[in-house]
Amino acid sequence: VFVDPIHESMDALSVAYSLLKSHEVIDLLIIMLGTNDVKERFNANAACIGAGMERLILKAKSVDCWGTRAPNILVVAPPRIGDGFHDAVMGEGCVEKSKGVAEQFRIVAERQNVHFLNAADCEFNQVDFMHLTRKGHAQLADLLAKKVPTLL
């Protein structure tokens, strides 16, 4: 959600309207964000990152892209950053902050009456300790294959 002064166009909020309108009618919006928001330069804790997700959900709900149906949104919490990760760009504390993101997203999803899926157990790589491996992508695909049909 946060505007990154180093990496252009990394904030979902500023592009949400155009993306949703260009793909209407939306049957199901799946949002899997949050890892970049733990960067030290944003000075945001897990609760603040959850508030950012809530703001994005509210934005998505407000866009006239749902046809005659109510907004149907699935929030997917990404795996937490691995303990072996140390990177100057992400900054100190990103590993610890990432541990609380899934719970905050669950709370926000419940409050906003949207769906929630925790991808915490999907395997991430040992290079940047954030992005999914081939196996992790397969695990996420399995989770989504079970969840998505129940939402449509």
Regions found by a protein language model. Give the residues of each.
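Acidic/histidine-rich helix-loop elements
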Residues: 1-11
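Alpha-helical cap/lid subdomain in secreted, periplasmic
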Residues: 9-152
